[in-house]
Every structure is written in structure tokens, then in C-alpha cells.
């Protein structure tokens, strides 16, 4: 199946962790990315203005994008831009989408792309959270592998997968995508730690099965159903039932379960329990 063609607006190229994820996903051929020169200029102009890059580095950044995606650039005639009816500041983006035969414009500025202006061209504007979440739903392992590879290639500073996910979470830019990626990447760690804790430390529960009351979480398991409930305002954060996993775990949850797993291993080793 041919990857969908997408125009990426300058406003989502500007935040670097998000830009990297979008470009890495395109490099992995999860979608076909397109830009115009005006879109790239808008992105690098903001990067220079905010002090994130010098003019020289901005030029090299553009060159890198063009070299990585040689088929991505589209030339947009001024006459087509003038014919667009969306927000004047982003008419060049819609025109670029038409030239690229793109089906989606990924943008933070959804209000600049009203449906009425896009429908004649069968184009949809999507928030980056919606777009990345759709990529996840289509192929979870591939998009999570993109995140793993992205983390592996970051050197200044080096980042773990967990730290990269935390960076994407900042400013609440792509919350649903982050939630799904984190659960996919770390659910096995959390679930196996919970099961081990219930086996070693759990006691019979009033509702049947076994439970463990920790300082921050209540673990409960009966048959093939496992729940983890946070002792804060969130309530249940993870449920395994009928071979399906549902929930939303935070960065702090992952860290605490990693520590808990280490302590369990130490306790088992000390007590000689397998």
C-alpha cells in the first residue's frame, strides 16, 4: 500500500523533538513527506529567532532535509496561492498540498485551515497528535521503532527512549501519541513487575484473587485480569483483561516500577526465592 502524501507545516517543524519524530517517521516510509521552500523558510526563521540555531546552521538544516527527502520539495505558483480561501498567512501551505497531491496537512494552526477551504481538494488538516496517533494505530511496532532509533541517534545530549518520550510530552503537544507509545514500550515491564509482586508479596483479596497494597499503587489480579490503581486522583492506570491491555501510565509510573522491579529482584536474591 502506497504511503499517504503529507504536507508538514512550518509550525510543527519548529519544535525540534516533534520535528525529529515526524521526519524520522517519514524516513521510515510510514508516510510521504512534502514541503515548499516557504514552509522550510518559516520553520528555520523561527529557529533562528528563538536562538535555537544560527543562520549558518539553519541553512545546513534545510540542506539536510532536502538531501534526506529529495522528492519532498514542491514549487508553488503564486497564482494558485492567490486562489486559496483559507487564512491568508497559510494559503501557501494549502497550495503546496494541492501541488503535492497530499491528503493531509499536519499543523498546529487548525483554525487556519477550515474544512470549507479544504474540502474541494479532498485535503484534511490534522493536529500532529492526531496524525502521529494514526500512524501508531496503523503500525505500532514501526512507529515505536522510529522512537527507539531516534533516541539511539541522539548524542548531544544522549537520551534514553523514556527521556525522549518525556521531551515529546513537554507542553502537552502530542499527549495521546505519547501515552500510547509509553504504554506500548513499557507495559511489559510494569505488568511483569506487578505479577511478580503479587506472587511474592500479595495477599488474598476480599473480591477474590490476590492484591498488594503499596504506598502509591494497589495491585490486584484474579485469573487473567490484572489491574493497577494509582493512589492519587487518577485511579486505575492499567488493566489487562481478555489478553488486551488498556490504560495510561506516566513517566513517573515507569520510573517507580523500574525501581520496584530492582527491589523485588534484590529481595528474591536475598531470601533465595525464585
Kindly label every feature range from the protein language model.
Residues 70-104, 138, 154-158, 167-188:
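Active-site neighborhoods of divalent-metal-dependent phosphate/nucleic-acid chemistry enzymes
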Residues 110-187:
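Acidic, PIN/NYN-like endoribonuclease modules and their adjacent C-terminal/linker elements
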Residues 189-216:
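Negatively charged, low-complexity tracts enriched in Asp/Glu with abundant Ser/Thr
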Residues 34-77, 144, 150-172:
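PIN-domain endoribonuclease scaffold, especially VapC-family toxins
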Residues 193-197, 242-274:
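Mixed-charge, Lys/Arg-enriched low-complexity segments
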Residues 219-259:
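Intrinsically disordered, low-complexity regulatory segments enriched in Ser/Thr/Pro
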Residues 5, 16-50:
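PIN/NYN-family metal-dependent endoribonuclease catalytic core
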